């Protein structure tokens, strides 16, 4: 007769040890050594000692959480946000901005095997010109409006946010009060806020039709606050309620965009980044320049003010159309935009028949594997690669170095202070 036994529950003893942190990784975690391997501890800074509890023990590394901190680093700051540690938006408000930048630069230098020559940064607070706040109205409870908890889908009710542009942060209580007064609160999905050169935008996502009374209340609110209001009943539909089409200024150009178009969150760093790209490429009046993953022309259009000709290639048709509109609006007749998928075989795409002296690329996190071979074939004198993922940047850089290019400048872009996001830009020159 078969006999069945219940497996005994495995009891894991949570080991408490005392460690001293000697480094900070780019995500803001303290790094100590234990049993010959790296031990990652959120919330601890270099030179701090603590009693910690091992929570995960792998072959190559381990993780722990702080039980009791024994001393404070001089680099420790008091977080400005009352939601820090619960809200998933920021991870490093307890770290001085200088240490944040040093740790990110060190991580970038290790990956790229090259010193970081520049740190491009702006104000560490009030820098976000765009934010999306989740909305939820549980039965018989007040409206929830805020960001997601770290590692959770739960909403943290945000009353203030010190990294938001001041104009947006000041609006939060009034937006909450307006939305809470609507009859259709249970049908609200999220609200997006954008601070553009043209003023403040509010995009409200709702999952069922709003009543005429709710629409009227929202319109009155938009007029009283002087903002442009857009309703998004479906993912692809945008209804203008009030205000004008948004725009922002960049390097002497006025760039219009749709409320849902991607624009860089940090305006100050974006302006410096574009200026540095123009400088590094050393754009001259006779140059033919290629801009890959160009979006709506954040780099393309400023490049066109200096070069003989510029071609921008982008996979999102709406952004391509906006780039063309902005070229016409700004009187730039030497720029051409192509809508193409750069993850496919680019050699058969019409733009690829041209020759180019200089290339700029700004891919998404997946990097630019699909176009690296063609870029190398073009043999441009200079290449500027803007990256939001240092791992794929390092991979793509290896292909360029193996083809005879050299990294001559490396910059860390502090686009998202107080977070673990690490952005960068590199200048490659053909040797």
UniProtKB/Swiss-Prot annotation:
Q: Where does S-adenosyl-L-methionine bind?
A: 264, 293, 298, 314, 341, 362
| Alphabetized Gene3D superfamilies for the sequence | 2.40.50.1070, Nucleic acid-binding proteins (2.40.50.140), Vaccinia Virus protein VP39 (3.40.50.150)
GO biological process terms on file = rRNA base methylation
Enzyme class per UniProt:
transferase
Question: What are the catalytic residues?
Answer: 388 (nucleophile)
E.C. no: 2.1.1.190
Q: Which terms in the Gene Ontology molecular function aspect does this entry carry?
A: 4 iron, 4 sulfur cluster binding; iron ion binding; RNA binding; rRNA (uridine-C5-)-methyltransferase activity
Organism, by scientific name, is Salmonella typhimurium (strain LT2 / SGSC1412 / ATCC 700720)
Instruction: List each copy of the TRAM domain by range.
Output: 10-68
The chemistry this enzyme catalyses reads: uridine(1939) in 23S rRNA + S-adenosyl-L-methionine = 5-methyluridine(1939) in 23S rRNA + S-adenosyl-L-homocysteine + H(+)
Q: Where does [4Fe-4S] cluster bind?
A: 81, 87, 90, 161
Q: Name one Pfam family in it.
A: TRAM
- Name of this chain's protein: 23S rRNA (uracil(1939)-C(5))-methyltransferase RlmD
Q: What does this protein do?
A: Catalyzes the formation of 5-methyl-uridine at position 1939 (m5U1939) in 23S rRNA.
Recorded hits in InterPro entries, A to Z, give: 23S_rRNA_MeTrfase_RlmD (IPR001566), MeTrfase_TrmA_AS (IPR030390), MeTrfase_TrmA_CS (IPR030391), NA-bd_OB-fold (IPR012340), SAM-dependent_MTases_sf (IPR029063), TRAM_dom (IPR002792), U5_MeTrfase_fam (IPR010280)
Give the UniProt family note: Belongs to the class I-like SAM-binding methyltransferase superfamily. RNA M5U methyltransferase family. RlmD subfamily.
Keyword set, alphabetical order: 4Fe-4S, Iron, Iron-sulfur, Metal-binding, Methyltransferase, rRNA processing, S-adenosyl-L-methionine, Transferase
């Amino acid at each position: 007769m078969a006999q069945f036994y219940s497996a005994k529950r495995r009891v894991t003893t949570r080991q408490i040890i005392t460690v001293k942190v000697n480094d900070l990784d780019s995500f803001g975690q303290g790094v100590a050594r234990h049993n010959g391997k790296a031990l990652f501890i959120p919330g601890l800074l270099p030179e701090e000692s603590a009693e910690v509890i091992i929570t995960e023990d792998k072959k190559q590394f381990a993780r722990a959480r702080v039980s009791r901190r024994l001393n404070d680093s001089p680099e420790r700051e008091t977080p400005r946000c009352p939601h820090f540690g619960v809200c998933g938006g920021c991870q490093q408000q307890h770290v001085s901005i200088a240490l944040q930048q040093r740790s990110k630069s060190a991580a970038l230098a290790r990956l790229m095997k090259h010193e970081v020559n520049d740190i491009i940064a702006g104000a560490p607070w009030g820098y976000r010109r765009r934010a999306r706040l989740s909305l939820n109205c549980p039965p018989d409870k007040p409206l929830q409006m805020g960001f997601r908890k770290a590692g959770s889908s739960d909403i943290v009710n945000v009353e203030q946010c010190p990294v938001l542009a001041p104009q947006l942060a000041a609006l939060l209580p009034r937006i909450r009060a307006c939305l809470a007064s609507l009859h259709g609160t249970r049908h609200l999905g999220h609200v997006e806020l954008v601070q553009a050169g043209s003023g403040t935008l509010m995009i409200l996502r709702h999952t069922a039709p709003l009543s005429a009374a709710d629409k009227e209340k929202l319109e009155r609110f938009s007029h009283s606050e002087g903002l442009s209001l857009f309703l998004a009943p479906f993912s692809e539909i945008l209804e203008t309620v009030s205000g004008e089409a948004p725009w922002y200024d960049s390097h002497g150009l006025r760039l219009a965009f749709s409320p849902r178009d991607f624009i860089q969150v940090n305006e100050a760093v974006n302006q410096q980044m574009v200026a540095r790209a123009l400088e590094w490429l050393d754009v001259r009046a006779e140059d033919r320049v290629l801009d890959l993953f160009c979006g709506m022309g954040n780099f393309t259009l400023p490049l066109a003010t200096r070069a003989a000709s510029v071609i921008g290639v982008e996979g999102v048709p709406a952004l391509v159309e906006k780039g063309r509109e902005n070229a016409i609006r700004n009187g730039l007749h030497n720029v051409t935009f192509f809508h193409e998928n750069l993850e496919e075989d680019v050699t058969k795409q019409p733009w690829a028949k041209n020759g180019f002296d200089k290339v700029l690329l700004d891919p998404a996190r997946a990097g630019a594997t699909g176009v690296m071979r063609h870029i190398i074939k073009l043999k441009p004198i200079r290449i500027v690669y803007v990256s939001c993922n240092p791992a794929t940047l390092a991979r793509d850089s290896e292909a360029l170095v193996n083809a005879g290019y050299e990294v001559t400048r490396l910059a860390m872009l502090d686009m998202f202070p107080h977070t673990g996001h690490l952005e960068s830009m590199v200048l490659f020159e053909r040797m």
